[in-house]
A protein has these predicted regions:
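Gram-negative bacterial Sec-dependent N-terminal signal peptides
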Residues: 1-19
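Low-complexity, acidic/polar, glycine-enriched regions of mature
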Residues: 20-191
């Protein structure tokens, strides 16, 4: 009986340890759209999104640890107006021919009940790298009904100063340099 108890305890420990292992997730590009809101001379707010992004998330929800490594294709920016898209990709703003990618790399922090509340790291954008904290307002994981793997999603918010990234276009006309990031992201557990 004593041996049986030890085996049961060992099996329980092994199961717990297996569940606590970090899980890697791949960003689902068909459900991930980094969006942004930027001031237009204090008159209105312009909104746009990036249609192509990729990356990985590694997370151990029991231990409350994780990492994020995301790349955004700056040529996929879309304001909903072709002329504005062309201007934004040009020398006045993104210079996407010279700086085709934005890259966020950081750690997941502030876990509550297995859910991260922020990602703290650096954003490389337009050839400049600055610290950025992304606030995770909503986070949930489910068993994906079609892929039969865990699928996690989040709504993420942050504000950056685009002048710190070398993009002060319009400042002389009264444009605010603050850009609000609104990111919907989904990531599926790697096979």
């Amino acid at each position: 009986m004593h041996t049986l108890s030890r085996l049961a305890a060992a099996a329980l420990f092994a199961t717990s340890a297996a569940q606590a292992a970090p899980v890697s997730y791949n960003i689902d590009p068909s459900h991930t759209f980094p969006s942004f809101e930027a001031d237009h001379m204090g008159i209105s707010t312009w909104r746009g999104k990036f249609d192509r992004s990729s990356g990985t998330v590694t997370m151990d929800r029991e231990a409350g640890t994780g990492t994020v490594d995301i790349v955004v294709d700056m040529n996929s920016g879309d304001f909903g107006l072709d002329a504005l898209n062309k201007m934004a990709k040009g020398k006045e703003l993104f210079e996407s021919a010279k700086y085709p990618k934005a890259h966020f790399k950081g750690t997941l922090e502030g876990f509550t009940d297995g859910a991260p509340t922020r990602a703290v790291g650096t954003l490389e954008l337009h050839g400049k790298t600055n610290p950025v904290t992304l606030d995770i307002k909503k986070f949930k994981c489910i068993q994906h009904p079609m892929f039969k793997r865990e699928d996690c999603g989040a709504d993420i918010y942050a504000t950056i100063d685009r002048e710190q990234f070398g993009m002060p276009a319009g400042k002389e006309y009264g444009f605010s340099m603050a850009v609000d990031l609104r990111i919907q992201v989904e990531a599926i557990a790697a096979k």
